[in-house]
Structure formats: structure tokens, C-alpha cells
Amino acid sequence: ENKDSTKTAESEDVSDIAELPTRTTPIWKIHGSHMVTRLPPINSLKSFYKDKWDPESTFIRVAAFDMDDTLICTSLGIKFGRGPHDWKWRNREVLPVLEKKVFRENRVLVIFTNQSSVSVTEQRALVSRLYKNLTVKPGFMAASLDAQYGHYPMLFFASTGKPRKGVYPRSSDETHFSHRKPESGMWSELERYLKRCFGPQYEIDKEQSYFVGDAAGRDGDHLAADKGFAENAGVPFYVPEDYFGL
């Protein structure tokens, strides 16, 4: 195994986002082979919240969500979509509730999703059809929010599947495991990114933050990964039916 390549893959930090003071467009980044992110440039996020938060407080309130079958679903309501454009908001309550519970309260909006079918490294980004498909949907979601409510930053974290043997640089099995829900690796990446944006003194207010997801271990749920993710991150958990009042 190419140990140097593995080290390089795991040494990439999610907070390593270019500080471009005039840029607001989110930046896609591939982290080794275990995660991809779509994050606003640091100065852009800091500028957005500058006049919205209490200057005396160093606590950040986060509203975090799973993506598929929580915020969105396929256009026909079937389990698997037919492409990156085959999506819609899960129901008509999603946007009004986000506006009320996230935007009005000036929370940081975050999506955490497991995408094990997407296997990608930086070198293979241009030839990975599934990665290209993955990068389309969050952009359309953000555009839909912006069109209705004006610009509001949306942070996106996706854990990705292991590449086939011989593909480098690749992350270790341990890193893949720790960044896949229900493990809390992606939450830790969010914490590092926010500290980079606002300063090392800032902390997520875990009592006032939460995670919403459909994989709660109920009868009919495919997994309990979302519930376990919230527990491992130390934040309250809600299922979409309760959060959106369905």
C-alpha cells in the first residue's frame, strides 16, 4: 500500500478553504476518499452572520439535516432517483418551516448525508459520474432556497464510499468508518470549519442545536444511523414528521 498517499488523503482538513474576501460561491472539495464538502468561503460565512449574532456570545446554534427522505425525495416519491435532477422538497411544509426555525433564528444550516455509492478521489473527480451527479443536487437546493428567501448559506457534508483497491490517494478504513453516520466524524469536521470561520473561542451550542433525519430505528426505517449520529454528536434528534409537523 502507498502509505504516503494514505497520509496525504487523511491530512486534508475541512477547514482548509481559501480565504477569498470577495467570493461567496460555495467551494466543492474532495477530502481523500472519505468525504466531499460544499462550503462557503470562510470570510463569506463570517460576513453573513456578522450582524445577525449577539456580539457578546461565542455559541453557535446549528440546524442540521439528513438530505434524502428528510429534506428532499424523488419527484415520483420512489426510493431511488433517476438522476441528479430527479428531486423535490419532501413536502410543502419544508420551506416554510426552514424559514421559521432556521432562517429567522439565524442558525447555521447544515446537511450531513451518507453517500456510500459515490466513490471518488481528487484524481478521479472528472470521470466519476456518481460524483458529478452528487454535486448537482445541493446546488439546486440552495438555488431554490435563495430564490424564495434570498441568499442563505447551506453547508454540505457527504461521507463517500471506499474506492476499489489500487486507487490512490485513499483514506484508511478507519477514516471512512469514522466519517460515516452514525459515527460523528462529519460533525467534528463542521466544528473545525466553524472555528476557522469565526475563531477558536467559538463553540456549537449543543443544547440549542439539533439534527433531523429519517433513519431513526423505527418500524419500517432502514437504519438508525441518523438517530445514532445525533447521539454521538451530543445534540437533540428529531424525525422529519415531528420537526416539519407532518
List the model feature ranges, each with a label.
Residues 1-67, 75-79:
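Non-catalytic pre-domain segments flanking phosphatase-related domains
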Residues 78-85, 119-129, 166-180, 217-224:
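Short, flexible/disordered intra-domain loops and linkers
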Residues 135-179:
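A short, structured active-site edge motif that brings together acidic residues
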